[in-house]
From Swiss-Prot:
GO molecular function: haptoglobin binding; heme binding; hemoglobin alpha binding; metal ion binding; organic acid binding; oxygen binding; oxygen carrier activity; peroxidase activity
Native organism: Capra hircus
CDD domains found in the cross-reference section: Hb-beta-like (cd08925)
Protein name per UniProt: Hemoglobin fetal subunit beta
PROSITE patterns the UniProt entry points to: GLOBIN
Recorded GO CC terms: blood microparticle; haptoglobin-hemoglobin complex; hemoglobin complex
PANTHER family registered for this protein in UniProt: HEMOGLOBIN FAMILY MEMBER, HEMOGLOBIN SUBUNIT BETA
Record domain Globin: where: 1-145
UniProt keyword Iron present: yes
Amino acid sequence: MLSAEEKASVLSLFAKVNVEEVGGEALGRLLVVYPWTQRFFEHFGDLSSADAILGNPKVKAHGKKVLDTFSEGLKQLDDLKGAFASLSELHCDKLHVDPENFRLLGNVLVVVLARRFGGEFTPELQANFQKVVTGVANALAHRYH
């Protein structure tokens, strides 16, 4: 999936990520850009506008939780299916989340990282992160197959 150099570049940048801020923004943007994903978060309260979503403390808290889990997965880049097996089972069997949403969230995360890191987020680094988020999305969707 990733060479040693590609892994190092991903881990180096991710070490600079403020998980709380980036996680909250990524989940918030997912809910704004792809409003049908809101159905999984109706219990979060006010999701009536972009401002409401991006300012919602439950969205921010869950976004942090998601990115904390993503961060843990980065420690197992060679076994993403194993790293995310229990979450795949939860999202498939209990939550019934459309696995396409994992891909969408990964793409939104890449956008947020590009926005936050600007020129430091080179096209090569973007390609490396895209490989990672695709791998994570595939691992989360594994139970569905």
